[in-house]
């Protein structure tokens, strides 16, 4: 078992919308992942994956694009990754049916609303107490309006 607690989701969630750059319908599902998995995007239309890490960034003009050396690209990942970072999600599988994450409301808010409800388990199976002892809804209530 790892000395550092790692967080994942307690269940799966599916979101859909439109890709802001492609204009195409996009659907993604976020699922729990084991400790040390990290955030991994799985392209369902190509059966390949890309890990969200600095080395996979292939562009950041208008949208962040991730791509492994010989895998598919996934773009417009920045709002979803901001959601994971803000809520402390270390490990998740993100299945996406095309090349672009849906834009939803144009921010991370809808991702946060969906993910924070499932942020209940650590990768080791223990209960997640939340950031600084607060659960996600409590921490969010302390944020300034409009943040």
What are these regions, as identified by a protein language model?
Residues 1-147:
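Core subunits and conserved enzymes of cellular information-processing
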